């Protein structure tokens, strides 16, 4: 879970997925398509609560339905599989996130970052690296700011927030990630 740029671009996150896999972890990267749903869904909230264009909300709702229809065959196949998890439903993600942060929180990754972390926790992925772009206050609020509440609601949550910026120490990032992985191993051996 993280800032979409830091999550999706290996050069922006010091090749985090490769690092996790080299350390023996299975990396689960939230779907980029879900970020598009988040952008569309925000328009629905704005029209209902902030007085923005109903036409924009209608187009966004149509966008959600079209993309859902296009990915429906894959979602159904994932649901039947033992090895894959079907894509999240944006309304469920929003409903889950709204228990912790307001859906009106739309700056940066907004409420969606919290929703993604909850989705990972609900799909038995308790070990989360929350990548943070340096100086992005909205991401720090909805990333680092909700970790305590997530741990309270999900004691199995093993979440580490990592700042990625040109001046950040790669060694510090690596040490914090390895500490999270060490905790994950200890928790796994308890099961």
What would you call each of these model-derived segments?
Residues 1-5:
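Short, small-residue-biased leader/transition segments that mark boundaries at the very start
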Residues 11-116:
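Redox- and metal-dependent alpha/beta enzyme cores, enriched for Fe-S-associated oxidoreductases
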Residues 62, 190-191:
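Short, highly charged low-complexity linear segments
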Residues 10-24, 90-190:
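Hydrophobic alpha/beta core scaffold segments
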């Amino acid at each position: 879970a993280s800032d979409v740029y830091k999550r999706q671009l290996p050069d922006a996150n010091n090749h985090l997925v490769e690092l996790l896999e080299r350390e023996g972890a299975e990396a689960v990267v939230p779907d980029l398509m879900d970020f598009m749903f988040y952008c569309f869904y925000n328009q629905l909230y704005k029209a209902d609560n902030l007085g923005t264009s109903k036409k924009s909300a209608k187009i966004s709702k149509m966008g959600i339905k079209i993309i859902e229809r296009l990915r429906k065959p894959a979602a159904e196949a994932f649901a039947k599989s033992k090895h894959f998890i079907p894509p999240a439903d944006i309304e469920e993600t929003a409903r889950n996130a709204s228990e912790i942060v307001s859906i009106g929180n739309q700056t940066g990754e907004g409420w969606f970052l919290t929703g993604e972390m909850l989705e990972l926790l609900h799909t038995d992925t308790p070990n989360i690296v929350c990548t943070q772009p340096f100086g992005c206050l909205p991401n720090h609020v909805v990333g680092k700011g909700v970790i305590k509440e997530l741990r309270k609601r999900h004691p199995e949550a093993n979440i580490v927030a990592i700042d990625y910026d040109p001046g950040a120490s790669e060694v510090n990032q690596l040490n914090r990630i390895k500490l999270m992985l060490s905790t994950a191993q200890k928790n796994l051996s308890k099961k």
